[in-house]
């Protein structure tokens, strides 16, 4: 029964409909890359950077980001949401693509782009993360609970020489519980896609994502060898995380189950033109 309950979010389909359903619960904050200084977050006077809105947004609030390019490093929401009242980050409809990029200053600059670590019920939806090499990850959910990353695109990310143990994946879930990574696109990635890692990881969902053209990067322990996994699941005593309905094409390794990784649920994942489907 626990496994069935875990799969319910897949059947409900975390989609644009679900994201729209969260709007209107609280206050709206607006962000535009073209805005001047001194904005107050209203539609008429938007903030210039996403962090300004993220600091203020509380449970039930939505941060609307106007289409454009945003250079972001270590963005940290100031508040958690609550069950049914997420803090939501999404593009402002009708304004074009929101592209988020790490500043990529130095190879040793291992900071996350969006840092949801320790937060609960934050929803990140509809952004494009593109063309950066040195970030620790695009989204960090270390110790997070109930957070969602949906309908985002992750394109041309990573660098083969970055070998830090915690800078291998696009999305990092360490000791996280009940989070969802759904309906996203990962293309041309160096390294790992989604990592579910840690003894306290439980009840996380990775579903309905597509993974295309992955290649390897170094590991701190691996010498000159290069490694890549689209979904990496390891080091957990509880397990009961679900990996379902994902699609993989032109990747070396689709799903890697390591050190208690077999305690989890895999359902109806598909692969085409890949070397290894599931490694345990």
Residue ranges and their predicted role:
Residues 31-71, 76:
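Acidic Gly/Asp/Thr-rich repetitive segments characteristic of extracellular carbohydrate-active
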């Amino acid at each position: 029964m626990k496994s069935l309950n875990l799969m319910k979010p897949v059947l409900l389909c975390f989609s644009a409909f679900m994201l729209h359903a969260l709007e209107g619960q609280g206050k709206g904050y607006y962000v535009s890359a073209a805005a001047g200084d001194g904005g107050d977050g209203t539609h008429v006077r938007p903030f210039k950077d996403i962090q300004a809105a993220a600091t203020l947004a509380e449970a039930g609030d939505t941060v609307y980001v106007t289409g454009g390019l945003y250079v972001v490093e270590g963005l940290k929401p100031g508040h958690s949401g609550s069950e049914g009242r997420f803090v939501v980050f999404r593009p402002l409809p009708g304004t074009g693509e929101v592209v988020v990029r790490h500043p990529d200053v130095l190879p040793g600059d291992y900071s996350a782009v969006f840092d949801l670590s320790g937060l609960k019920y934050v929803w990140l939806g509809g952004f494009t993360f593109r063309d950066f090499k040195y970030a620790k990850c695009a989204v960090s959910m270390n110790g997070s609970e109930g957070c969602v990353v949906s309908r985002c695109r992750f394109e041309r990310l990573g660098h083969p020489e970055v070998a830090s143990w915690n800078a291998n994946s696009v999305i990092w879930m360490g000791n996280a519980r009940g989070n969802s990574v759904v309906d996203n696109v990962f293309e041309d990635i160096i390294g790992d896609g989604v990592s579910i890692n840690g003894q306290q990881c439980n009840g996380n969902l990775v579903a309905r994502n597509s993974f295309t053209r992955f290649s390897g990067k170094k590991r701190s322990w691996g010498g000159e060898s290069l490694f890549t996994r689209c979904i990496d699941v390891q080091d957990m005593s509880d397990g009961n995380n679900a990996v379902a309905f994902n699609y993989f094409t032109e990747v070396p390794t689709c799903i890697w189950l390591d050190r208690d990784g077999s305690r989890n649920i895999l359902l109806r994942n598909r692969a085409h033109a890949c070397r290894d489907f599931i490694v345990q």
